[in-house]
């Protein structure tokens, strides 16, 4: 038994020769064992629950995607097409087997992955039907209808959002007006002033008066400054010179008149001795001149005193 077990024990493979449809292994005990591909498929492992769910969701996603065939025109790029059809550049590359962006310029048409029930499939007459391939394709030609519809939908949505926002603001304003009943008059005045056109506001604004004493020049105009400079620089010196000349002439004439009126220095008169006539003497031949001489002496004496 022991020898038999040793003879029938596991032996390493000594040679492997490939064959068509199967492979053969030769062991040390010269026993041959063949395994076919069908036997190998019988041992396929089953996937777990999460992997099965992930595969089912991925298959559902692939079923939801439809490929639209679009002709490439001049000026088209991968980025512009991806923005137009709301898909990524990687999805477009994957659908068209593009390795680089330069391969895009060698194509005449492009497969674009879109959702099955999206606005892009609804706008076209050729609705995607179930085809033999797992994901259906439909050929389209680019028309401006899709862009216009997108613009109209986006503009309508933006208009609706703006209207909702304005309505909410109106409600808030109405609540504020109701809560502030005492100041309703002031609010009405504010609303009326806001509703008036801008031209009326410009007309109603009073003209701002400029301060006449504003600035470093104290509000003077340029002609006022020129007049002051002329008065200080020309008129004042001329008047001063004229006044000085007239004053000098008047002073000189005054001195000359005083000198002419004032008498010159007089020599002191020598008193002559009076000779009284003797009683017994004979009368002088000039006795008739004595009263005149006495009068002159009297005048000189008064002048000296």
Curated annotation (Swiss-Prot):
Q: Where is the composition biased (Polar residues)?
A: 121-144
Cytoplasmic domain ranges by topology: 243-305
The UniProt transmembrane annotation reads 222-242
Comp. bias regions, Low complexity: 146-156
The record's annotation in Pfam families points to: LysM
Disulphide bridges in this chain?
none
Q: Which UniProt keywords apply?
A: Cell membrane, Glycoprotein, Golgi apparatus, Membrane, Transmembrane, Transmembrane helix
In residue numbers, the region (Disordered) covers: 31-60, 121-156
UniProt cross-references to Gene3D superfamilies, sorted A to Z: LysM domain
UniProt superkingdom: Eukaryota
Q: Which residues are exposed on the Extracellular face of the membrane?
A: 1-221
Q: Which InterPro entries match?
A: LYSM1-4, LysM_dom, LysM_dom_sf
What GO CC terms are in its UniProt record? Golgi apparatus; plasma membrane
| Protein's cellular compartments | Cell membrane; Golgi apparatus
Q: Which PROSITE patterns match?
A: LYSM (PS51782)
Whether Ion transport counts among this entry's keywords is no
| Glycosylation site residues | 29
Stated membrane topology is:
Single-pass membrane protein
| Principal location | membrane
> What's this protein's function?
Essential for Golgi structural integrity.
Which PANTHER family would you find in this protein's record?
AND PUTATIVE PEPTIDOGLYCAN-BINDING DOMAIN-CONTAINING PROTEIN 3-RELATED (PTHR20932:SF5), LYSM AND PUTATIVE PEPTIDOGLYCAN-BINDING DOMAIN-CONTAINING PROTEIN (PTHR20932)
Question: What is this protein's record name?
Answer: LysM and putative peptidoglycan-binding domain-containing protein 3
To which species is this protein native? Danio rerio (Zebrafish)
């Amino acid at each position: 038994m022991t020898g038999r077990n040793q003879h029938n024990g596991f032996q390493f493979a000594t040679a492997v020769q490939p064959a068509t449809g199967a492979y053969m292994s030769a062991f040390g005990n010269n026993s041959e064992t063949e395994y076919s591909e069908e036997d190998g498929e019988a041992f396929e492992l089953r996937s777990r629950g999460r992997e099965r769910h992930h595969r089912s969701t991925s298959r559902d996603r692939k079923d939801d995607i439809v490929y639209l065939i679009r002709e490439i025109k001049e000026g088209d790029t991968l980025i512009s097409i991806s923005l137009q059809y709301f898909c990524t550049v990687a999805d477009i590359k994957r659908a068209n087997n593009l390795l680089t962006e330069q391969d895009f310029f060698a194509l005449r048409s492009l497969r674009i992955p879109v959702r099955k029930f999206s606005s892009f499939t609804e706008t076209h007459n050729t609705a995607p039907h179930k085809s033999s391939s797992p994901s259906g394709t439909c050929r389209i030609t680019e028309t401006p209808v899709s862009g216009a519809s997108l613009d109209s939908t986006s503009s309508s949505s933006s208009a609706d959002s703006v209207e909702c926002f304005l309505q909410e603001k109106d409600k808030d304003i109405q609540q504020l007006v109701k809560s502030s009943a005492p100041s309703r008059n002031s609010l009405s005045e504010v609303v009326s002033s806001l509703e008036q056109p801008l031209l009326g506001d410009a007309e109603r604004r009073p003209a701002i008066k400029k301060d006449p004493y504003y600035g470093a020049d104290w509000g003077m105009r340029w002609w006022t400054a020129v007049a002051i400079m002329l008065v200080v620089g020309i008129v004042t010196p001329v008047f001063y010179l004229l006044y000085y000349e007239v004053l000098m002439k008047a002073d000189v004439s005054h001195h000359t008149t005083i000198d002419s009126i004032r008498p010159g220095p007089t020599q002191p008169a020598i008193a002559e001795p009076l000779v009284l006539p003797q009683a017994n003497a004979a009368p002088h031949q000039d006795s008739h001149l004595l009263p005149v001489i006495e009068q002159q002496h009297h005048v000189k004496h008064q002048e000296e005193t």
